[in-house]
C-alpha cells in the first residue's frame, strides 16, 4: 500500500520522547497497539483495528515513511512489526522479564535493551525496501507512507474470497493475489 505526497508517519521516534500528549502519526499507527485512547474525540478504543494487516500474511508488516521535518529537511523512517497469537504453542516472541506475553514485537534500530526506534538511515532503508518490494523509495521532495505486507498467505486470503463467491461466477482476480489486491 503506497500513499504519496501526504505528511507521512510524523512525530517523535519513541514514546519516551512524547511531550504534551503529541504522539504523532508514527507512534499512533505502529506502536500504540492495545493502549487505551485518552484524547477527547479519539476514534476507536484500543487500537486493535490496526492489526488487520497482520491477518493476511505471516504476521509481519513493514512501515516505511518519508516526512518533512519542521527544519525543512526530509527524513525517512522504517520500522517492522510482528503480531502473533501469543497463546499458540508455536509462538516465537519470548516473554520479556516478568511481563505478560503480548504477541507483539517491533524491529528497528536498537537503542537499549528491548527498545528500538525506526531506522532513519536512507541507504539502509533503500536496500530493505528494494529487496521486499522492488519499488523505489521516496526521493527529493516526495513524502508519503508505504505499508508492506510480505509473505501474504494465499491459502488464508483467497479461500475466504472464493467461499463468498461459490454461488456466483468465480472471478479471475479472486484466484491471484496481485489481481485481488
Residue ranges of predicted features:
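Flexible ATP-lid and adjacent glycine-rich G1/G2 motifs of the Bergerat
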Residues: 1-72
Amino acid at each position: 500500500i503506497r500513499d504519496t505526497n501526504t505528511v507521512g508517519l510524523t512525530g517523535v521516534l519513541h514514546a519516551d520522547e512524547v511531550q504534551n500528549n503529541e504522539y504523532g502519526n508514527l507512534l499512533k499507527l505502529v506502536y500504540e497497539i492495545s493502549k487505551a485512547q485518552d484524547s477527547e474525540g479519539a476514534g476507536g478504543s484500543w487500537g486493535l483495528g490496526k492489526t488487520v494487516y497482520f491477518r493476511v500474511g505471516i504476521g509481519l508488516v513493514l512501515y516505511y515513511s518519508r516526512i518533512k521535518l519542521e527544519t525543512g529537511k526530509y527524513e525517512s523512517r522504517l520500522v517492522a512489526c510482528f503480531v502473533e497469537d501469543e497463546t499458540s504453542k508455536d509462538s516465537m516472541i519470548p516473554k520479556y522479564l516478568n511481563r505478560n506475553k503480548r504477541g507483539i514485537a517491533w524491529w528497528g534500530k536498537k537503542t537499549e535493551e528491548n527498545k528500538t526506534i525506526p531506522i532513519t538511515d536512507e541507504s539502509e532503508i533503500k536496500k530493505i525496501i528494494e529487496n521486499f518490494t522492488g519499488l523505489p523509495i521516496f526521493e527529493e521532495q516526495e513524502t508519503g507512507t508505504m505499508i508492506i505486507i510480505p509473505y501474504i498467505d494465499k491459502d488464508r486470503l483467497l479461500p475466504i474470497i472464493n467461499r463468498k463467491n461459490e454461488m456466483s461466477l468465480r472471478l479471475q482476480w479472486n484466484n491471484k493475489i496481485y489481481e485481488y489486491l
